[in-house]
Each structure stands twice: as structure tokens, then as C-alpha cells.
């Protein structure tokens, strides 16, 4: 099924059909958004120390908070995503990501302690990143395709390309504008999740076969393998 979006132009009314190809493109952009929220803040660690006077110890805590919030969201999302629906959840994920990026550029200069502003922004980004991590792969897996394995491989490659893009484009921004204007950078990056949020609100989504059956959270917490994987990620 395709969704039809009505577009009003100066030359008259036109219709654009959104198909599963647009859903796949939105998913690829979703993983680029994931790369932005995970990798932009570490690029600013030196700026946080020199411009905001935040100590290295407090900066390193941001990494732990980001990881912890994302893991918590991953655990809780299995239950409440079924309640609000996939579309609302993925739209909310991009809204959190955009809000976190904007907050990263604004809140440090609006709070008594700049660290509090940065911490709030990191938490918002982590919520968006956690939901995105849970949903994007199932969304792509549910799409009708003759090459699901290829689509999934390409999907995860987009995170790597997004990481490279964040580093290269952010470095180019600093070279042209200087680190003194760092606060504008995350606001500019927020355009990506905002645009993709609108796209996900309109593209067709498919229901994954058998997605009504889920392992209860309590059963997951009792699994020794789950705790082993968590320990490995923390150590990494």
C-alpha cells in the first residue's frame, strides 16, 4: 500500500506516492541520525573543557550516561512500543534526537552550570538513539523485498558512513567557522532528524510477522546470557 501526499506547487497540484522505497530511505537516514547523536558530542569534548570549563572527569561521565540511558530505553521499549505503535515511536525517536541536538547548542548557555545543560541534551539524544536502535532494523526487515539480507547489510553500513560524515563535516565546519561558534553545529545537525521525522510520519510501514509475540522483560532479566552481553558492552 502506498501513501499519497498532496503537494501544492506554483504550477498546480501534484501527487507524490510514498512507497516502501521511501521507507527504506527513511530507515537509512535514521541510522545516519543515530550516528549523529552518538558521535557528535564526543567531537565536542575538547570544546566543553576549553569553552565551558567542564572537567575531564565530568565529561567522561557523559559517555556512561549516554550508554546507560540507551540501554534502559532498549529494555523498556519492548513493552511500550506495542502500546503506542511503531510509527508514533519512530517519530518520537527523531523528535527526541532533534530536541537533544538543539538543546546541546542552547542549554549550556542557559543553565547556571553548563554541565547540566550538556547532560540534559545527552539524555534526550540517548532516548532518541535508543528508540531508533530498537525500531529501524525491524522496520527494514518487515519491508517486502527480494534481497532482505542486502538491505539489512546496507542499513548497518549507513551508520558507519554517517559516523564518517559527522566527523568530516563537523571538522570542515570548525575549519571554516572556528570552535568559538560550536553551539551552532548541533543545531544545524538537528535538521536531519527533523526532516526524517516528517518522512517517517508519512511513509508506509509494514507489520513484522509474529511481532505480537515478545519475550517478557522479566524473562530477559533472568537470562544469564543477557547479563553477559551487558557486561561485555560495559567493558568495551
What are the residue ranges of the model-derived segments?
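Extracytoplasmic
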Residues: 22-48, 52-54, 137
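Helix-loop-helix hairpin linking two adjacent transmembrane segments in secondary transporters
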Residues: 146-147, 154-205
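C-terminal ends and interior cores of transmembrane alpha-helices
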Residues: 95-112
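Short hydrophobic/small-residue motifs within alpha-helical transmembrane segments
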Residues: 67-68, 160-161, 233
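Juxtamembrane intracellular "pre-TM" segments in multi-pass secondary transporters
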Residues: 12, 16-18, 207-230
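Central cavity-lining transmembrane alpha-helices of secondary-active solute carriers
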Residues: 61-79
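Cytoplasmic helix-loop-helix junction between adjacent transmembrane helices
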Residues: 121-157
Amino acid at each position: 500500500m502506498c501513501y499519497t501526499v498532496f503537494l501544492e506547487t506554483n504550477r498546480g497540484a501534484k501527487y507524490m506516492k510514498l512507497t516502501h522505497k521511501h521507507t527504506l530511505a527513511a530507515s537509512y537516514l535514521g541510522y545516519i541520525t543515530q550516528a549523529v547523536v552518538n558521535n557528535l558530542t564526543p567531537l565536542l569534548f575538547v570544546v566543553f573543557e576549553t569553552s565551558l570549563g567542564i572537567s575531564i572527569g565530568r565529561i567522561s561521565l557523559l559517555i556512561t550516561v549516554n550508554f546507560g540511558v540507551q540501554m534502559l530505553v532498549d529494555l523498556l521499549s519492548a513493552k511500550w512500543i506495542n502500546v503506542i505503535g511503531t510509527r508514533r515511536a519512530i517519530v518520537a525517536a527523531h523528535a527526541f534526537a532533534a530536541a537533544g541536538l538543539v538543546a546541546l547548542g542552547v542549554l549550556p548557555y542557559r543553565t547556571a552550570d553548563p554541565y547540566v545543560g550538556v547532560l540534559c541534551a545527552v539524555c534526550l539524544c540517548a532516548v532518541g538513539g535508543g528508540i531508533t536502535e530498537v525500531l529501524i532494523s525491524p522496520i527494514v526487515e518487515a519491508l517486502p523485498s527480494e534481497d532482505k539480507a542486502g538491505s539489512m547489510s546496507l542499513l548497518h553500513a549507513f551508520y558507519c558512513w554517517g559516523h564518517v560524515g559527522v566527523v568530516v563535516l563537523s571538522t570542515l565546519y570548525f575549519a571554516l567557522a572556528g570552535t568559538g561558534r560550536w553551539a551552532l553545529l548541533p543545531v544545524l545537525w538537528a535538521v536531519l532528524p527533523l526532516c526524517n521525522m516528517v518522512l517517517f510520519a508519512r511513509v508506509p510501514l509494514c507489520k513484522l510477522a509474529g511481532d505480537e509475540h515478545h519475550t517478557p522483560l522479566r524473562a530477559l532479566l533472568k537470562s544469564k546470557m543477557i547479563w553477559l552481553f551487558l557486561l561485555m558492552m560495559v567493558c568495551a
